Amino acid sequence: MSTIIGLFTEMLPAGGVQRAGRHVAAVAAKFAAERGFAYRFLSLNDPPGPHTVRVGPAEFLFSGYARNKPQFGLAALRAAGRQPLLVIALHPHLAPVVAMMRLRSGKLRSIVFAHGLEVWQPLGWLRGTALRSADLVIAPSRDTAQHLVSEQQIRTGRIRRLAWGLDPEFEARLRASVPPSRPADFPERARVILTVGRWDPADRYKGADTLISALPRVLRTVPDAVLVLVGEGEDRPRLEQLARDSGVANHIHFLFGLKQEELFACYAHCDVFALPSRGEGFGLVFLEAMACAKPAIGGAHGGTPDVIEDGVTGLLVPHGDAALLSSALESLLADPSRACEMGARGRERVQADYTFEQFQTGLSHAMEDVLIRQH
């Protein structure tokens, strides 16, 4: 039976790339079932053995390889010897595995996803050559697409822009008639600035430290302002120390280990969402905040300007500029009507452009187009 193969870095943990992987796998599994194909999904960094994942009403299976690169590579090569039709790789770093699979099966078509920061610099000979050999490279934003051309020398005809969409579970919560209750430890009677991310040293580009540095100035005009940071990571002690050094520790809350319904409630009960990153390839968290009718503040870099329309659905600020960030926060916290209008515009934009159904349609068309080239 003809098979669609999926290669993933990781799917089970929280995180934007992980969630994107789940979305791609769900769409690919549905695409295969509707056409009488089989599918085989492999994940390099997830725990060993078989796993079942649900995305909305759909379920799919995949095998984890616990960071064992030789076993993962051998499994991919074995899959390439069993009537493979199409291989989809969720990260440019997996492109060399795709290239090896295509050496074994000359008719195998390929799609590789790029995200953002990882393609801002040349990938090196092996990964770069493998990426350039893909039939199609999918980018979530104009910025990522431009870096694929300028830094990776991918021909524009082999690049397709496809924005991510909201998670079906998140969409279902938006349709619920009963508003979510305030999460435990979420501040009450305060103007809440929310940010969501993974707080590891490698993720400092997301700008959590700039948010903390901007808070003292915000408090001068909005004394009941509070910053809520949702997420885990090894950089949390450094951020907590920065909060103490800045004299704002009493105005900062770290929340971690939240369930999806608790994260949704954080969006629903905040006043402003902010992630002043310099390197977002897209930023799924912006979609989630905007879907909950919250104004979003992001970095004026990377793929963020594709999502946030400056002055309409939110505000864009230069990465690392605490003064401009504090001004943006003050302007929205001190003017609830403006914030409400931006939030409403953001929700309209998400409903118009960023649903899971739209992502599913776009990826299905991309797979069809690549397979047509085979004939």
Residue ranges and their predicted role:
Residues 237-258:
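Nucleotide-activated donor-binding/catalytic signature segment of Leloir-type glycosyltransferases, i.e.
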Residues 278:
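Aromatic "clamp/platform" in nucleotide-sugar-dependent glycosyltransferases that forms part
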Residues 310-311, 315-322, 331-337:
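Conserved acidic donor-binding segment of nucleotide-sugar-dependent glycosyltransferases
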